[in-house]
Amino acid sequence: MAIVKMKPTSAGRRGMVRVVTEGLHKGAPYAPLLEKKNSTAGRNNNGHITTRHKGGGHKHHYRVVDFKRNKDGIPAKVERIEYDPNRTAFIALLCYADGERRYIIAPRGIQAGAVLVSGAEAAIKVGNTLPIRNIPVGTTIHCIEMKPGKGAQIARSAGASAVLLAKEGAYAQVRLRSGEVRKINVNCRATIGEVGNEEQSLKKIGKAGANRWRGIRPTVRGVVMNPVDHPHGGGEGRTGEAREPVSPWGTPAKGYRTRNNKRTDNMIVRRRYSNKG
């Protein structure tokens, strides 16, 4: 894929950068793999806002993506590459030799007509899924499981990947894009290559309305609120924050470490912020 800068024919298109979608399927998605997706607008079952700045936006169907890739030994042909409104990565529709169809995250470089295979005996080829114990050290991988059989949880967004650094006993060491080195069970599966649509990070939406289409509402700065609404609020005229940046509830907002999962601390060999002081 490539990017294109839009001509400044209006204020909204000035500075807009889009990803060229040539080669993507132009028709409707595969209906049997669609599910209804209800919008919560950031509210819980009591109607209370649990996530701010959400609401509105276009309605979407959820595309059921196969993150387990557990149909071993059966070759699957890539029928087409599709846009998925629910994620930054593109998805590929596979047709297995027995007639079943499944969506997967589309790896970089994959095209319609390619044949993919899952299982321990699969070749080391972009798009194939294998247990980590069968993948050579130094291979670039994505869609990595954290627990055997649970399905891919790591490196699923556009352009994401990880590198298999070492294997020792029951665990392998994987370096993520963030710099974090993590231990993964060698029976967990991973897909060869990296996720496609890597130009996604270069996209510029151009106008506020494009965020509203995505269900993202405006964010109001704390310094323009009243003291009752935010720790940064109040003052006569324009004032600064007068304290360290915090959330509306007083939690430090920039660089504050919030991880609190001691159960899995021993699985992290090197933290992602180890070079940040």
From Swiss-Prot:
Q: Mind telling me which Gene3D superfamilies this protein's record contains?
A: 2.30.30.30, Nucleic acid-binding proteins, Ribosomal protein L2, domain 3
* A GO term from the CC aspect: large ribosomal subunit
Compositional bias per record (Basic residues), positions renumbered to this chain:
50-60
Biased-composition ranges, Polar residues, are: 39-49
Report biased composition (Basic and acidic residues) as residue ranges.
229-244
Report residue spans for region: Disordered.
37-60, 223-265
The record's keywords, sorted A to Z, are:
Ribonucleoprotein, Ribosomal protein, RNA-binding, rRNA-binding
Q: Which HAMAP family match?
A: Ribosomal_uL2_B
The free-text function statement in the UniProt record for this protein reads:
One of the primary rRNA binding proteins. Required for association of the 30S and 50S subunits to form the 70S ribosome, for tRNA binding and peptide bond formation. It has been suggested to have peptidyltransferase activity; this is somewhat controversial. Makes several contacts with the 16S rRNA in the 70S ribosome.
NCBIfam families in UniProt:
rplB_bact
Entry protein name = Large ribosomal subunit protein uL2
